[in-house]
Each structure stands twice: as structure tokens, then as C-alpha cells.
């Protein structure tokens, strides 16, 4: 086991690492807390000293492009309605549905893990046994997960330290819970504020095996261990960078341009009064009369001119539009403002708009599949143990059937055209039916209706060979006999 001193050192070093610092920036931007919040306005006074201007407008508005980018990507990648775990073995598919595809808890946790991975650059999920004695999974905030390699530990074993702030007591002190995991058991610790780390006195079993349970009404407690540390990490990329990295500067520039324009409008929102021939006592009286009575007295040759200030907004507006375009481009997201909500928006235009998001989703899927394989390994081992089977990883594959919105009117027109084409082809076949045998005719009709002929051929009636042809031949024969009788001998009427 790790010593208390080791645990404190590992947690402190991890919190100060550049990796976690960058991850915290991603979290801050995802929550809409941008650098513009710290923006300050300064000026140089008459003595040449730099001072903060607290009277000038300093509007601070955050534009959460990153939040939209992440949520949009997560929902698109996980948009498949039938789940991702697939198998051609019906019994195995039923088990996979129970663990993953039809499990709302797993869907929610997987969405949280993928969100955390995109926001921070990496996120963890850990396995545990639920009340039904089945393996379940839960997202673990990676900011509180510390990976300890065996070479750095005193016991030469791999460890995972998982900490979180449990609550704040009545005195306002934060109570931190710390879990030290190894391949067999978990130690539980407690820390108040930055005080001493000590074993948690409220845990009845400490250390605790990964799983403890009882059989029926027995008073005996049994325990099991996974045999490995049940924490699995999902990385956004090889370097574990947040997806904020390529667009952070653009978002900051957009915030600055937008807030700068707001400040200009705020500072120049009132008109200037140019008063000529003023005979009042003082300017305060003039200001009061202007704002309240909407009138002012001037001399015989006096006059009042109202002047406004033109705000140079065109340059800022152009820069805002350029920044927004580049945020979506380099963030590889869908800019819905480029899609007009009209019937003229074709499926081809929609697909083109989704091209960058589709490319990003393809990259994410590769790492997501590797991650899901690790979860599958745990579940397959449990399924085989319970059912006495020998299912392998090769028996399972992943299918990400992402959904892209389409133009419903265009789809309806395509379906109508296709139906008309099929109707024309079937009519043509019926017109030449007298020249085809019944089996060939039915095969051609089934092809047009997307029906498997082999599935229905045994259900078809047993017609005489080429019935339409025989019927036509019979009719021709009757007509021939009648003509012969008409042309045979008889009385001639003159």
C-alpha cells in the first residue's frame, strides 16, 4: 500500500501539472467562464502612471462556442438509436443489449465520459458491481484521478488515486475523500481542507475488496476483486489535449471584438447638446431642464444643436463574422447559420455542411472503439462465467449509425419518383406477360418490389403453364372455328 506521505505528494504534484492545468481551462470555457471575465481597462494619468479606469464601460460577455462545439459533437457521435454493440449471435446480442444498448444508465455515463474527454483531453470510467451483481460503469472526473506507475510507488505496484470533495461541513471546511486503488482492494482516506490525510473512520471495511456481497440469508460476507484496477481512460488524442486548443484564441478574439463594440455603444449612447446664447444661471440647470422638462431657454440669438457620434462598427462586425466562421471551421463543427431553413436546402447541401463534423466524428470513433473494447472485455468475462459460454471479442463489432437531418420534401419527391418508376416497370412486364412463363414473370415483378422470390414461390398458386398464352390461344381457336362455319356452304340470298 502507499504511505500517506506518498499519497499527498502524488496528489499535489498532479494538481500542479501542466496537463491538469490545461484541462481546467477546458472545463472553465465549457462552463462559459472565458478570459474576458478578467479583462481590465487602464489609462495613463497626468503623472505618467498606469491606473485602472473604473468609470469607463467594461462589458464582459462570454460567447460559449466551445460548449456548443462539444455538445454538438457528443450528440452526433452517439446519435445511433439501436446502440453500438452488435453481434450475429442472438444470445450474445441479448446480453449486450442488457449491459449496453438498452441501458439508459450506461448511455448517460458514456455521454459524460465523451464530453469530459473532449473538454479536458481525457476522461475516466470505472467498473463496479451493482445491486443485481452485474458489472456497471460510471464516469469518474479525470481532474480527481491520479495515475501512479509502479516504478514511482514504494510497493512497486500500479495505483489509481481518486479524490473528490464530498461536502462542506457546518464550519465551511471542505472534506476531501480519497480512494487508493490497486489490483485487489481499495483504501479509503479523509482530509479536511489542506490538513493531514488519515484513514476514513466512517468506512467499516478499510481496506475494502473491489466487490463484497452476501449469499441469500447467510451472515457470511464474501468478496471478489477484478484482478486489475477498474479504471479505463478515454483520450481525445495522442497528446491528451482539449479540443479547445485550436479555437481558444479565436473565441477570445470574438469576445474582445464583441465586448469592445458594446463598450463603444455604451460610452457613446447619449447625444451632445451644443447651446448658443445660453442665459441660465449654470450648466446644472441646463442639464436638468434638458433631461426632465425636455426644454431649455436661450437668448434672442441663441440656438441648441443636438449632435451624435458615429460609432465605427463595420470593421468590428467584419472581424466578428470572420472569427465565427473560423471557430466553426477549425473546431470542425456544424455552423447552422450556413443552412437556410427553406425547402431549397437540398440533402446535398446538408451533407456538405456536416462534412467537417463528420470528419471529426470519424476520428473520435477510432479511439472510442478502443475504449469500448476494454469495457467489453470485462463484460464478456462476466457473461462467460455466468452462462458457461466462451464468447470472444471477435464475436462483437461496433456500429455507429449517425443520423443527419434531411429535407423531408426532397425525400418525399424521391420516393414518389421511385414508386412511379417501379409502377411503370411492372406495367411493362404485365404488357408482355403473354410472352413469358409464369415463373419468370413473378421473378421480375419480385425484383421490382424488393421481394425475395424464394420466400414466396411456395405460396403461389399452381397455374397451368403459361396461362395467359393458353387463354389467348383458346380465344384464337374459337374465333377461327366461327370464321370457318361462316365461310362453309349454305343458301345464298339474292
Briefly describe each language-model feature range:
Residues 30, 42, 54-58, 62, ...:
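Conserved aromatic-histidine-acidic binding/catalytic patches
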Residues 210-349:
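Extended, charged amphipathic alpha-helical segments
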Amino acid at each position: 500500500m502507499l504511505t500517506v506521505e506518498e499519497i499527498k505528494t502524488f496528489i499535489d504534484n498532479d494538481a500542479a501539472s501542466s496537463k491538469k492545468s490545461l484541462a481546467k481551462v477546458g472545463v472553465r470555457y465549457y462552463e462559459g467562464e472565458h478570459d474576458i471575465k478578467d479583462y481590465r481597462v487602464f489609462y495613463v494619468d497626468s503623472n505618467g502612471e498606469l491606473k485602472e479606469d473604473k468609470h469607463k464601460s467594461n462589458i464582459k460577455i462570454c460567447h460559449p462556442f466551445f460548449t456548443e462545439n462539444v455538445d454538438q459533437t457528443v450528440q452526433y457521435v452517439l446519435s445511433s438509436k439501436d446502440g453500438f454493440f452488435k453481434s450475429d449471435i442472438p444470445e450474445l446480442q441479448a446480453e449486450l443489449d442488457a449491459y449496453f444498448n438498452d441501458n439508459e444508465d450506461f448511455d448517460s455515463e458514456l455521454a459524460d465520459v465523451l464530453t469530459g474527454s473532449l473538454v479536458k483531453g481525457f476522461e475516466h470510467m470505472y467498473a463496479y458491481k451493482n445491486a443485481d451483481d452485474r458489472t456497471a460503469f460510471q464516469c469518474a472526473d479525470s481532474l480527481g484521478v491520479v495515475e501512479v506507475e509502479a516504478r514511482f510507488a514504494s510497493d512497486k505496484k500500479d495505483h489509481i488515486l481518486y479524490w473528490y470533495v464530498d461536502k462542506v461541513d457546518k464550519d465551511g471546511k471542505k472534506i476531501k475523500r480519497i480512494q487508493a486503488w490497486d489490483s485487489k482492494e481499495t483504501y479509503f482516506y479523509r482530509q479536511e481542507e489542506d490538513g493531514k490525510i488519515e484513514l476514513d473512520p466512517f468506512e467499516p471495511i478499510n481496506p475494502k475488496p473491489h466487490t463484497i456481497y452476501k449469499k441469500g440469508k447467510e451472515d457470511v460476507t464474501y468478496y471478489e476483486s477484478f484482478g486489475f484496477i477498474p479504471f479505463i481512460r478515454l483520450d481525445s488524442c495522442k497528446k491528451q489535449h482539449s479540443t479547445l486548443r485550436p479555437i481558444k484564441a479565436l473565441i477570445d478574439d470574438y469576445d474582445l471584438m464583441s465586448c469592445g463594440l458594446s463598450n463603444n455603444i455604451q460610452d457613446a449612447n447619449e447625444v451632445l447638446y451644443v447651446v448658443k446664447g445660453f442665459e441660465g444661471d449654470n450648466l446644472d440647470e441646463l442639464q436638468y431642464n434638458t433631461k426632465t422638462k425636455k426644454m431649455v431657454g436661450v437668448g434672442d440669438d441663441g440656438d441648441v444643436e443636438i449632435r451624435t457620434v458615429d460609432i465605427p462598427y463595420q470593421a468590428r462586425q467584419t472581424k466578428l463574422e470572420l472569427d465565427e466562421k473560423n471557430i466553426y471551421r477549425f473546431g470542425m463543427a456544424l455552423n447552422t447559420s450556413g443552412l437556410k431553413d427553406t425547402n431549397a436546402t437540398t440533402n446535398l447541401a446538408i451533407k456538405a455542411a456536416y462534412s467537417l463534423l463528420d470528419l471529426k466524428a470519424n476520428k473520435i470513433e477510432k479511439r472510442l472503439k478502443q475504449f469500448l473494447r476494454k469495457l467489453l472485455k470485462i463484460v464478456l468475462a462476466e457473461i462467460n462465467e455466468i452462462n458457461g459460454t466462451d464468447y470472444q471479442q471477435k464475436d462483437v463489432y461496433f456500429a455507429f449509425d449517425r443520423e443527419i437531418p434531411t429535407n423531408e420534401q426532397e425525400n418525399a419527391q424521391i420516393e414518389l419518383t421511385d414508386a412511379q418508376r417501379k409502377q411503370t416497370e411492372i406495367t411493362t412486364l404485365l404488357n408482355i406477360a403473354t410472352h413469358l412463363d409464369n415463373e419468370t414473370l413473378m421473378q421480375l415483378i419480385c425484383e421490382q418490389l424488393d421481394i425475395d422470390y424464394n420466400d414466396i414461390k411456395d405460396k403461389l398458386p399452381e397455374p397451368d403453364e403459361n396461362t395467359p398464352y393458353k387463354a389467348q390461344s383458346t380465344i384464337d381457336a374459337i374465333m377461327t372455328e366461327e370464321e370457318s362455319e361462316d365461310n362453309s356452304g349454305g343458301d345464298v340470298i339474292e
